[in-house]
Amino acid sequence: MKKIFLAIVILTISFTTFAGRTDSIPAKHSDVASVDAIINSLYNVISGPAGEKRNWDRMRTLFIAEAKMMATGKRQDGTIGKRVMTVEDYITVSGPFLEKEGFFEREIGRKAEQYGSVVHVFSTYDSKRKLEDEKPFMRGINSIQLWNDGKRWWIVSVLWQSETPDNPIPEKYLN
């Protein structure tokens, strides 16, 4: 009985691990060949007009399987909170909204630091519902951790915070 239980546990863990693997889908080389390429691909894949389905498989190819996506900001009660998601959580939670409402996010500033195969990017963004909108409805900073495995770049994590009146983006992150 113990052997059967152990076999079931091992199979369950194996299936759970491989079912959500983002690195099992081949990436388009031009999406992951450089830091610029992977950052541009990230913004591109979440952006599009209302009614347009996003290429979520393309998004999956940008991230390591264990990647985290986290939003942080001030709650209504004044405390600072966070929401931690997997790539699949992000697609499930944000995907329908982005596709229904329309969403275009673009990079308007970048600061990057590299040590070996690790890069940290502070990527300042603005967001619009339609490309032709005169003003963005939101701005903020994406803190993006990247890793190169010797063949390509991967996104390890994205932590973002939107700008607020009491927390404007410093000028040094806008150029």
For every predicted segment, state its role:
Residues 139-168:
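Short beta-strand edge/turn micro-motifs at domain boundaries
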Residues 69, 73, 81-132:
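Surface-exposed, charged secondary-structure patches
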Residues 80-83, 132-135, 165-172:
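A short, polar/proline- and glycine-enriched secondary-structure boundary/capping micro-motif
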Residues 19-61, 175:
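Short, low-complexity N-terminal intrinsically disordered segments enriched in polar/charged residues
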Residues 43-50, 63-67, 71, 94, ...:
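Sec/Tat-exported extracytoplasmic proteins
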Residues 42, 59, 67, 121, ...:
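Hydrophobic pocket/interface hotspot
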Residues 75-76, 126-129, 160-165:
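Solvent-exposed loop/turn segments at secondary-structure junctions
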Residues 1-24:
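Bacterial Sec-dependent N-terminal signal peptides
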